[in-house]
Regions:
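Sec-dependent N-terminal signal peptides
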Residues: 3-14
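Structural detector of coil-to-beta-strand junctions
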Residues: 67-70, 81, 155
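Extracellular/lumenal carbohydrate-interaction signature centered on repeated Trp-anchored short motifs
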Residues: 41-53, 110-120, 148-151, 169-176, ...
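Extracellular glycan-interaction patches encoded by glycine-rich segments
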Residues: 152-178, 187, 209-213
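Acidic glycine-/aspartate-rich tracts in secreted/extracellular proteins
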Residues: 58-64, 77, 101-102, 128-130, ...
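Extracytoplasmic low-complexity segments
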Residues: 15-34, 42-48, 52, 63, ...
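Short structured motifs
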Residues: 36-41, 102-109, 163-165
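Extracellular glycan-interaction surfaces
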Residues: 16-32, 54-63, 83-148, 182, ...
Length: 265
């Protein structure tokens, strides 16, 4: 009889365990009407004007007549320094704007925005002293563009085409963003190739060996890493690089950003 009396209590405790288990989400799912604001580029840099901006990203269903923007850098004069758009009617095409010039659409073999489970590493290497380079995974998709870019007073916006005072606010993103990285250097092609083959997110102690010794490599130039791993909805995206370049999520009325288990842990 004692065992029978304890059994309901044990079952109740077991149920509580199941209910309180937390799900760790790996990415954010944008469905229009939402964006993330980061700091002005000049305030985030350490020394040089050399940058590499990277996204692990996948597509999703589009419900708009506009071309969704993955990100934008718009300066204080409302000039688009750099932006990438996915073309609504094409699953393998992107359009890039550099220094307010819209380049012809680029068709890319192997790109499929209609597949929400296929994540791509998109890398932008830019500075005011060298021409811009853009990669999809380890393949250059804009290797010879003669454009130098001074993004100093531009604010990094992810998920839309936005200027700092939001008088421009359009082309909202549709799709998944798994991780964002910002480096204060132009990464080597070999580094980007290595990263594209290893989609796992950088761990908390990526700058250290197993023995706790600091690794002095290109990793020291990582000035922003936003892993987008959440256990609950938050409006602030913390920067795990140690430089406190946090981002803030904004949404229009009637819109939201969803937490998703898609992507790397």
């Amino acid at each position: 009889m004692r065992l029978l009396k304890l059994l309901p209590l044990l079952l109740m405790l077991s149920c509580i365990d199941l209910i309180t288990q937390k799900t760790v989400y790996n990415s954010l799912y944008f469905k229009g009407g939402s964006w993330v604001e980061f700091a002005v580029m000049d305030s985030m840099k350490l020394e040089s004007n050399d940058f590499t901006l990277q996204f692990w990203v996948a597509g999703g269903e589009v419900d708009t007549n506009e071309a969704p923007a993955l990100f934008s850098l718009v300066d204080s004069q409302d000039s688009i320094k750099l932006a990438l758009f996915r073309d609504k009617g094409q699953t393998n095409t992107i359009t890039i704007v550099i220094n307010s010039e819209t380049l012809p659409p680029i068709e890319i073999n192997g790109l499929d925005w209609s597949d929400p489970d296929n994540f791509y590493l998109i890398s932008f290497l830019f500075s005011d002293t060298a021409d811009i380079k853009i990669f999809l995974n380890d393949s250059p998709i804009l290797p010879t563009e003669e454009s130098r870019l001074n993004a100093g007073d531009s604010k990094l916006m992810v998920g839309a085409l936005v200027n700092e005072d939001r008088t421009i606010l359009e082309n909202f993103w549709y799709g998944y963003i798994d991780e964002i990285r910002l480096w204060n250097t132009r990464l080597a092609d070999s580094t980007i190739k290595f990263q594209s083959k290893h989609s796992d997110k950088m761990g908390e102690y990526y700058r250290y060996t197993m023995d706790g010794e600091e690794i002095f490599t290109y990793l020291n130039s990582l000035i922003g890493i936003w892993r987008l791993n959440f256990e609950e909805p938050l409006s602030v995206i913390e920067d795990d690089s140690g430089y406190n370049n946090d981002g803030i999520i904004y949404t229009r009325t009637g819109y939201s950003v969803e937490l998703s288990e898609k992507g790397a842990q």
